[in-house]
Amino acid sequence: MIPLTLIDTADLPDGGTLRLMHRGADFVILFGRNELMSSRLRGSEEALATLGCAKLGSKAKATVLIGGLGMGFTLRAAQAVLPATARIVVAELVPEIVTWAKGPLAHLFEDCLDDPRVSIALGDVRDPIVAGAGRYDAILLDVDNGPDGLIHVANDRLYGGAGLRAAYAALAPGGVLAVWSAYPDKAFAERLGRAGFVVDERKVRATGGRKGAHHIVWLASRAG
């Protein structure tokens, strides 16, 4: 087997380090021994955008907030379904992730960061959510490993009751909060309901095909 080769590292605000590595044509981002992202598994990240933005294809000036740039799969899927007049804000906590997108991972991103619809906001995605006040038609969260925070302690605030109520307030009427997770989480689904959302839990394939592990996407809608 071809060994993993280290490309770069990124220190996290709460301590710990992300490692960008590759094995042949496959790129991975690791936190400790946990694989957070892989270039070979993009199906569920793409589903986060296609499901979360499903009703926005014909909405003029739709505004979408994406939490987490990752390897760009959610962003590119959102770009594919959103109209030319849309605005897409990507909040990314770790500056090196953006640097990697323009460097060793540029082949995955292609020219998606040059799209005039896209802007990058460095910092915690919770900040634009709290300041949102009915601004967003969709909020797509692929932050950490899902509601069970792994790499950033503050993500507990994002996925807790107060954070979900803030997300509800940041959505326009009829807007959708879409949340990715590696695992099911009954308690989180219940918190979504208590925050006022109508909740639809979907199982999606990590590969995007008919085989492979399932991930979870919650579609939490604000009443229109």
Region annotations inferred by a language model:
Residues 218-224:
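C-terminal lobe and adjacent flexible extensions of AdoMet/dcAdoMet transferase-like proteins
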Residues 35-37:
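Short, surface-exposed beta-strand-loop junctions and turns on beta-sheet-rich folds
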Residues 2, 42-171, 179-180, 190, ...:
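The AdoMet/dcAdoMet-binding core of the Class I SAM-like
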Residues 1-30:
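N-terminal auxiliary segments of SAM/dcSAM-dependent transferases
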